[in-house]
Amino acid sequence: MPNKGFMRAFSTSNAFIKFVLRAGALYLILYLIYQFVVKRYTLYDQGFIGWIIESTDVVLRTMGYKTFKVLQDRDMQVIGIDGSNGVWVGSNCNAITLFSLFGVFIIAYPGNQRDKWWYLPSGILAIHVLNILRVVALAMIANSYPQYLDFNHSYTFNFLIYMFIFGLWILWVNKFADKHIQKDEQN
């Protein structure tokens, strides 16, 4: 006969298990919609890549760089500083999966719905701005230190973006969700 504590830990009445199941199901649904509908049948993905390219171009030009942009193909565009090879920006670079990851956590974690309505878009906007700054930095690295581009693309900036998202989650749990949970426990 299984241990009662073990069974209680893995029952659907356990708040953590509910959160994991809700978040997992929601992420799977969003992933499938993105992969099999949005990416295939809409121009949303390409438009978002274009928005990142244009925003990166504005930031680099504001910093005094001469830039170039190339439409590589339907799913890939290049932005760079004149004299460099530039950086490719594709559907894996547009941060939509990061928006989903962040959003799923906020939606699935208990908290005041009113707080979720402003925190979710604010967090997504912050992740988007950070992603644009990531592409700006990668373009600068491709120009000045191209030998470090792959490492920074694969490790440094992935680490920074995921830590930023983790920080947004911690802020949510400590400042908003806990407040909501504590109020529920007092009533």
Predicted regions and their residues:
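Hydrophobic N-terminal alpha-helices or hydrophobic patches in metabolic proteins across all domains
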Residues: 1-187
